[in-house]
């Protein structure tokens, strides 16, 4: 069986997670006042944790867009002229519904018992690129934003692969958000659409390190069964 991009990143996370478990690592918590903790627990939190891009030493696709004056416009299902991407929904996962980020093309969340502690999610964002785009440059810079995440510890530098017949780059590891050690698997796919318009597909898998065994089969399913029609 071919190991495709997102599943490869998840496998990298698994290796990192085993190391963390062996060291007795666990997510840390901030020293917040008791009343603040009570208030936070009473307010429903979104199942898809937001991720804010962080500045860092590694060059990124966003930086390339700024320098090359390229505009990225979010694309949603059914938008005229856009590629059609059919993602499978793996066993034990459901559509994110109202928790889907406004700019996302598609999102799913884990609905198993392990999600009671923290909800693993996989989010796909599709963007139409306007300007003079170098597709290979997108692949070369794909890992930058992931490597710039706070406290990122990668399992290697990432690898090139493909999804649905289109070139991709994947990277996985762990990072720290709000005092918690988290696992991440990111994949960037470059799609040559109609009239040679370039689209950028980004897949972001999010979980805690000890939830990777649950997330891994889902990423394998997505990598093996996703179809892309330009």
Question: Which ranges hold each PLM region?
Answer:
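N-terminal targeting sequences that direct proteins away from the cytosol to non-cytosolic compartments
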Residues: 2-104, 206-230
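Extracytoplasmic
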Residues: 82, 117-121, 166
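Short, surface-exposed beta-strand/loop micro-motifs that present aromatic residues
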Residues: 106-110, 183-194
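A short acidic-to-branched-hydrophobic micro-motif
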Residues: 108-137
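Extracellular/periplasmic catalytic domains that process cell-envelope and extracellular macromolecules
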Residues: 115-118, 162-164, 192-194
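Short, well-ordered beta-strand elements
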Residues: 122, 196-206
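Post-signal peptide N-terminal regions of Sec-secreted extracellular proteins
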Residues: 125-131, 143-149, 176-178, 187, ...
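Signature of long, low-cysteine stretches enriched in small and polar/charged residues
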Residues: 139-190
């Amino acid at each position: 069986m071919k190991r495709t991009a997102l599943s490869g990143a998840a496998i990298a996370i698994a290796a990192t997670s085993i190391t963390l478990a062996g060291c007795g690592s666990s997510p840390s918590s901030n020293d917040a006042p008791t009343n603040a903790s009570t208030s936070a627990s009473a307010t429903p939190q979104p199942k898809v944790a937001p991720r804010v891009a962080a500045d860092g030493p590694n060059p990124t696709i966003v930086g390339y867009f700024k320098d090359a004056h390229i505009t990225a416009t979010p694309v949603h299902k059914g938008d005229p002229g856009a590629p059609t991407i059919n993602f499978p929904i793996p066993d034990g996962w459901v559509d994110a519904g109202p928790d889907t980020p406004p700019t996302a093309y598609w999102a799913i969340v884990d609905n198993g018992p392990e999600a009671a502690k923290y909800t693993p999610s996989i989010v796909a964002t599709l963007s139409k690129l306007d300007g003079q785009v170098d597709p290979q440059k997108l692949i070369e810079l794909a890992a930058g934003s992931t490597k710039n995440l706070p406290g990122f510890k990668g399992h290697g530098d990432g690898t090139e692969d493909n999804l649905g017949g289109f070139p991709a780059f994947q990277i996985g590891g762990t990072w720290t958000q709000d005092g918690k050690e988290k696992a991440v698997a990111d994949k960037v796919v470059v799609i040559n659409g109609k009239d040679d318009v370039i689209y950028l597909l980004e897949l972001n898998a999010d979980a805690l390190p000890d939830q990777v065994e649950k997330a891994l089969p889902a990423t394998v399913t997505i990598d093996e069964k996703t179809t892309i029609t330009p």
